[in-house]
Structure formats: structure tokens, C-alpha cells
Amino acid sequence: MLSLHQLQFNIEQRNLFNLNITFLPSSITYIKGANGSGKSSLLRMISGIMQPNSGNIYYKNNNINNIPKPYCTYIGHNLGLKLEMTVLENLKFWSEIYNSSETLYAAIHYFKLQDLLDEKCYSLSSGMQKVVAAARLIACQSDLWLLDEVETNLSKENRDLLNNLIVMKANSGGIVLLSSHLESSIKSAQILQLV
């Protein structure tokens, strides 16, 4: 369970949000809102990268400030790839951080990355870099996924693979929060609208 208690974020004297909400296991939530409404900031706060002006975030009934990192898998605008490293080196790096090396090859096969393993990430298109970042969702075992505009620049095939993966995560008890400008293609997802 993920709970936001009186989570407030202000920017330039403007209150972007003041949230009290709980996300239950087995849930998918799209965070929607105009540019500048705080979607990315909210995901960054939940990941622990950014601090709110006030309020608390609890994951599994523990304040995230007291939980050892990493407790979630966050993919933001900066994909977290080491561009000078190969696809395989990047996925190994992340799977070792999460102590989940047994899922590394499942990630490679799910997203059909076998032919790209020795490619440096800087040589990949932005869409393929996002696919490598999305493969991290399998390579890194975590029950909380925070995805910021990950669907952008993906081919239809890779977007479908990602959406199926998101549904599988929720069906296995995970919590998935994602922001997207694209129309929600996961019918079971909830919508959190930021104004």
C-alpha cells in the first residue's frame, strides 16, 4: 500500500497539489494533468528523489524517508541509462543494485533485446533507449513502479509489451503509477487528475 498524507507541493507561490490518497496493491493509476501541473514532481517525490513542501509518503506503512533505497523502480525523463555502456552492461548494473540478477535474461527476451546487447546506449534511438529502460522493470524486482512518460516514442509493439507488463505487475500485487500524455490504453486503470 502506498499512501500520501497531506502531500503538498508549491512552486513560485502556487500550490500545485495537496493530496490525501491511498494506492492499493494490484492497482494501476494514470496521473493526468496539463504541463506544469506537477505530474513529474509527484512521481519524483514518491521515489524519494524530491521532497514535498509538507506532508508524508508511506509505503507498506513506513515513511519512505526511513526505507532503504531502492524501494521502487522509477523511470523518469532522465532514463537512468549509462549511455557509454552497452545495453547488457546497463541491465546488469541495475539488476545488481536490486539483487535480482536471475531476472536479467527474462527482461532481455521479453523486450527482444538479444541483438542489441553489445550496442552502446548512446547509439540507440530515443525509443529504443526507452525500451532498455523499460526492460529494467523486469530486471529489477520491485512492487512499486513509477513511470514518467515512458510510453512516449515507443513503437506500438513495444507500447503493447509495456502495457502487458504493467497489467501483469498489477495482477501480481504491484502498484503502478504512470504519467502519460497518451490516451490510457489500460482499461482497468484509475485516473488521478492534477489541476
UniProtKB/Swiss-Prot annotation:
InterPro entries attached to this UniProt entry: ABC_transporter-like_ATP-bd, ABC_transptr_haem_export_CcmA, P-loop_NTPase
Swiss-Prot/TrEMBL catalytic activity: heme b(in) + ATP + H2O = heme b(out) + ADP + phosphate + H(+)
PROSITE patterns from the UniProt entry: ABC_TRANSPORTER_2, CCMA
Keyword Transferase: no
Keywords per UniProt: ATP-binding, Cell inner membrane, Cell membrane, Cytochrome c-type biogenesis, Membrane, Nucleotide-binding, Translocase, Transport
Pfam families tied to this protein: ABC_tran
Domain of life: Bacteria
Segments forming domain ABC transporter: 1-195
Record field: transmembrane: none
Quaternary structure, from the entry: The complex is composed of two ATP-binding proteins (CcmA) and two transmembrane proteins (CcmB).
Primary role: Part of the ABC transporter complex CcmAB involved in the biogenesis of c-type cytochromes; once thought to export heme, this seems not to be the case, but its exact role is uncertain. Responsible for energy coupling to the transport system.
Record protein name field: Cytochrome c biogenesis ATP-binding export protein CcmA
Species the sequence originates in: Rickettsia felis (strain ATCC VR-1525 / URRWXCal2) (Rickettsia azadi)
